[in-house]
Amino acid sequence: MRKDIIFMGLVLALGGLCLATAVHGAQSGPGRVYLVLWFDTEDYVLPQTNDVAKRLATFLTQQGVRATFRVVGEKARMLERENRRDVIEALDRHEIGFHSNLHSQQPTIDMYEEPLNWEAGVEEYNRREGPGFEDVRRIFGQFPTNYCQPGATWAPQSYGALDQWGVKVYLCNGRDIGLDGKPFWYGRLLNIYNVPETGALRPNIDDSPESVNKPDTDWTNLEKVKANFREIYLRMSSQPEGGVVSFMFHPYEFITKVDWDIINFPHGANPPRSEWKLPPLRNPEVSARAFHFFENFITYTKSFPNVEYVTPSQVLMLFADVAQQHSFSSQEISRIAAGVEPEVSFQAYDDYALSASEVLALLNKFAVQTLRGRGSDPITLDGTPYGPDARSAALDHTVEIPWNQFSRTAQDVEGFLEANRRVPGVVWFGSQGVSPESYLVALAGVVKALQAKGAPPDPAVVGPAYLATAKYAVQDSRAWRWEISPDHVQRPDLIDIAKLQTWTLKPAKLRGGR
């Protein structure tokens, strides 16, 4: 896998150069609208869905559109077992992503991750999902550039494993994490997630088991979806930076009335393969209507000026995180310190954005370098520290810390960041433990004093603070409720971890608009 990751890095770097050249050579005009089309390619029960995926991929290739086919590990193995090289080759002309190893078989990802902390959850995700990732990579001969969880199985620990594998784009839809309906960075990955445009461009489909006894009125909202796209296009193209539109389909929904997994794994069921059922097929006229919807809509989107279909690896370049490997001057450090508030959050500027964990890393490095007589040296941001692995009790009053203790603690925090690449759950001033939020606010005050007066405050004041970005993470367990989960599912530990990882949250700035 290491060679694949290095190769993927070279591909992305070259892609970035091409995109940058195209952007800088463009004339000024309306903002460019980038379309990201993806298919969750997952049904490994009904063989006919293989031909649907091939038909969709072939049509797009003929249209000059490169989409993303995100494949489940078992689906890839199914194609290999059935010797469907024709399907594999058709999909391989597009970008490949990963969509879990077994999708809806129990336990689902959220279920096995719920009782685990961050580190154990990353390891378990590696153990269970890693074989599927490797099979998708091997069978398609292509590094899977992006990921989406199956249904409502989102788990924050997956980000740690995906980062280790070299996957840098989380392209999906859900309510678990979001930032005002726009792309963002979270867990070291670029997230095109929880954006409203995805739902607005979906066909009207009733895939409930009860729908088989009703008239099939699916795929009848083409004109409404076209109108939605036109509104989205006009809004985004009116902005100089343009925008990114993410929309998706499942190959199986073109020919089946009920989802393949809903009839096999409902409400926590996990029957053996010998008892799996084939989903009921649609009436041929309805399937024809579905393909007409798809083909007509794709050609409709291409009729607009300044519209370009892009893949996740290209999106990663369009949203390049220029804060990484940037050398921050003393003036920039001063601006960052001034931006720290007791409501700890990310910082967004015209040229870059910083997550709360990156702010902590930069300011702490500055304080330690100043202690060592190198306060004027530029500081390079090298990666994003993860959030803490556990919550600590928040201060409800201020405490005064002698400078000799604060300076020793700053060096201890620096060692922790270097060794663990995450924010400490508790910051210790001798026997006095405080939350990392309170430490960050006090640290910003120390940096401001060092820069303004050339001397640290003595004592340094540490007061109450809280992680304001936690509001952007899921707040209750309803986000994990879907037909595959057991009834009354509860995910309190995943909610806590999701909030802690908002230390890594920040806006993603589109740099390819024109």
Predicted regions and their residues:
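Boundary at the C-terminal end of the N-terminal hydrophobic targeting segment
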Residues: A20-A26
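Bacterial N-terminal signal peptides
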Residues: M8-C18
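Active-site beta->alpha N-cap acidic-glycine motif
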Residues: S28-D92, V244-M248, Y252-F254, I262, ...
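Metal-dependent polysaccharide deacetylase catalytic core of the NodB/CE4 family, i.e.
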Residues: R66-A155, G178-G181, G199-L201, V244-P251, ...
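C-terminal domain-boundary segment and adjacent tail
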Residues: V169-K182, K226-R335
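Bacterial N-terminal signal peptides that target proteins for export
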Residues: M1-G9
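Active-site-adjacent pocket scaffolds in enzyme catalytic domains
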Residues: N146-I262
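The substrate-binding groove and active-site-proximal loops of carbohydrate-active enzymes
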Residues: W38-Q48, R70-K75, E114-Y125, F143-P150, ...
